[in-house]
Amino acid sequence: MLSEAVRCLDHALEQQKYAFMTQEGIITLEPDDIYYFEYQSRKVVINSSQGKYIAAYSLKELYEKFSKYHFESSHKSFILNLIHIKSIKGFDIYMKNGDVVPLAQKRAVDFKKRFHDFLQSAFVEI
């Protein structure tokens, strides 16, 4: 019964769509469609499966909303969706879409641990 409730909650979280006010207008994205957020020139670039969009949000605000969907900060300018990480080599994170994102030295140990924990939980659920 409890596992069924958790599964329903996970499904509801996956189906959640978020509206973003961007320079192109309002767009809606599911968390799984977002590869990462990048802070650049006082704006946030939303890198997604539907393209790149520029919006006026803070990374702190986005992290608070998206950390429950397995988003983590690899660098002061990046928040990544752990689902879309292909591999980590040194201080470079290779994303499934082909982008390479930096991993800050001071965040490396904690980020790699969180990624490892995420992978462990993903394999247990299968």
For the regions a protein language model found, what residue spans apply to each?
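Inter-domain helical "communication" segments and dimerization helices
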Residues: 1-17, 110, 114-126
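Conserved binding/recognition cores within well-folded domains
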Residues: 2-96, 100-102
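C-terminal structural segments of small proteins and small subunits
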Residues: 100-105, 109-112
